[in-house]
């Protein structure tokens, strides 16, 4: 009886939401469902929390271009199942 609500990811034809993949350098992939008009900062922060990282430690790129926190999937013309790449910042040379 706990499963009364319909599953969300079933109707991907609804153009209001988009499924995005975030691929880390270690080969890990995390999937997110986000509204096309939602700033990507929400996805970026959620990814950092899930991975235990700070926003200062990593950079997000889509099609090789840096993503700004204010960008939305609609602005970047992202399509369903597109992939965002994550790169760790290279800082300093000491341990």
Curated annotation (Swiss-Prot):
Recorded family membership: Belongs to the ubiquitin family. SUMO subfamily.
Any one GO BP annotation for this protein: protein sumoylation
GO cellular component: nucleus
GO molecular function, one term: ubiquitin-like protein ligase binding
Entry-linked CDD domains: Ubl_SUMO2_3_4
Function field: Ubiquitin-like protein that can be covalently attached to proteins as a monomer or as a lysine-linked polymer. Covalent attachment via an isopeptide bond to its substrates requires prior activation by the E1 complex sae1-sae2 and linkage to the E2 enzyme ube2i, and can be promoted by an E3 ligase such as pias1-4. This post-translational modification on lysine residues of proteins plays a crucial role in a number of cellular processes such as nuclear transport, DNA replication and repair, mitosis and signal transduction.
Keyword field contains Ubl conjugation: yes
Major location (coarse): nucleus
Record-listed cross-link Glycyl lysine isopeptide (Lys-Gly) (interchain with G-Cter in SUMO), residues: 11
Keywords associated with the record: Isopeptide bond, Nucleus, Ubl conjugation, Ubl conjugation pathway
Subunit details: Interacts with sae2 and ube2i. Covalently attached to a number of proteins, including top2.
Domain Ubiquitin-like, chain residue ranges per copy: 16-95
Protein's name in the database: Small ubiquitin-related modifier 2-A
Propeptide, chain numbering: 94-95
Protein species of origin: Xenopus laevis
InterPro entries in the record: Rad60/SUMO-like_dom, Ubiquitin-like_dom, Ubiquitin-like_domsf
Pfam families: Rad60-SLD
Keyword Transmembrane helix set for record: no
Gene it is expressed from: sumo2-a
